[in-house]
C-alpha cells in the first residue's frame, strides 16, 4: 500500500516548514549571517531525507525533483529571522511543529523503504535517518554536540514511529491514510510527553582515573 500523493505532499510541506524554521532559529542563536541562516535551515529540513535517498539509491532526490521546496524552506527561514521573538514566544507551538516534523519525516522515510521492498529493519532505519539526521547535521554545523545524542528521546520517537507505521501497513494491512494518522498521533503524543516530563535515556559518563 502507498500513501496517496496529496497526503505525502501535505506531510512533507508541514515537515520541511517546521524544520526550516527551527534550523533558522538555531543559526540565529549562533549569530550567523543570512547565508548561514538559510543554509542551516536547508540542511535541517532536507538533510536527513537526502542522506536516506543516497543510502537507499532513491533518485532523484526529493528537492532535486521539486526545487520549489527549496524556495519554501528559504521563505520559512526568512520569516523566522523577521519574527524571532514571536517564534520564541510560541515555543509550545513550535515544539509541537517540531514533533510533527519528526514523525512526518519518519513516516516518509519508512514509506520510501517500503516502496523499495525493504523489510522491517531497513524501514525503521530509514525512518530514523530521515527523522533525525537533519538535526544532527544542524547541530554539528553549529558546533555543538547533537541533542539527539545527549538529552532527549528523539531518535527513539523516530524508531517507534517507523516500527508502528511498518507494522500497521505491512503486517496488519490497514489503509495507508489510517496508518499515517495513527502513527502521527502516537508519535507526536509520545514526543510531547517526553518533552513535558523530560524523559531521557540513561547517560554514560566516564572519567578516566589517572
From Swiss-Prot:
- Coarse class of the primary localization is membrane
| UniProt keyword Protein biosynthesis present | no
Q: Name one Pfam family in it.
A: Gly_transporter
User: Would the keyword Transmembrane helix turn up in this protein's UniProt record?
Assistant: yes
* Intracellular or extracellular location(s): Cell membrane
GO CC terms, sorted: plasma membrane
- How does the protein associate with the membrane? Multi-pass membrane protein
Report the transmembrane regions from the record: 31-51, 60-80, 94-114, 117-137, 153-173, 175-195
Keywords, comma-separated and alphabetical:
Cell membrane, Membrane, Transmembrane, Transmembrane helix
Q: Which family does it belong to?
A: Belongs to the UPF0126 family.
The protein's matches in PANTHER family, at most eight in alphabetical order, are given as: INNER MEMBRANE PROTEIN (PTHR30506), UPF0126 INNER MEMBRANE PROTEIN YADS-RELATED (PTHR30506:SF3)
Q: Specify the protein name.
A: UPF0126 membrane protein Cj0593c
> From which source organism is this entry?
Campylobacter jejuni subsp. jejuni serotype O:2 (strain ATCC 700819 / NCTC 11168)
Amino acid at each position: 500500500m502507498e500513501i496517496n500523493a496529496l497526503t505525502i505532499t501535505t506531510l512533507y510541506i508541514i515537515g520541511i516548514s517546521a524544520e526550516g524554521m527551527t534550523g533558522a532559529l538555531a543559526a540565529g542563536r549562533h549569530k550567523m549571517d543570512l547565508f548561514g541562516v538559510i543554509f542551516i535551515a536547508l540542511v535541517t529540513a532536507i538533510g536527513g531525507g537526502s542522506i536516506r535517498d543516497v543510502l537507499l539509491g532513491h533518485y532523484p532526490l526529493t528537492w532535486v525533483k521539486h526545487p520549489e521546496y527549496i524556495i519554501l524552506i528559504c521563505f520559512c527561514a526568512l520569516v523566522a529571522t523577521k519574527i524571532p521573538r514571536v517564534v520564541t514566544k510560541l515555543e509550545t507551538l513550535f515544539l509541537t511543529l517540531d514533533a510533527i516534523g519528526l514523525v512526518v519525516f519518519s513516516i516518509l522515510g519508512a514509506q520510501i523503504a517500503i516502496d523499495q521492498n525493504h523489510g522491517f529493519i531497513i524501514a525503521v532505519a530509514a525512518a530514523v535517518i530521515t527523522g533525525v539526521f537533519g538535526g544532527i547535521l544542524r547541530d554539528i554545523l553549529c558546533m555543538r554536540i547533537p541533542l539527539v545524542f545527549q538529552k532527549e528521546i528523539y531518535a527513539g520517537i523516530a524508531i517507534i514511529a517507523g516500527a508502528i507505521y511498518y507494522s500497521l501497513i505491512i503486517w496488519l494491512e490497514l489503509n495507508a491514510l489510517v496508518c499515517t494518522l495513527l502513527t502521527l498521533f502516537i508519535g507526536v503524543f509520545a514526543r510531547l510527553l517526553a518533552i513535558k516530563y523530560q524523559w531521557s535515556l540513561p547517560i554514560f559518563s566516564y572519567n578516566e582515573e589517572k
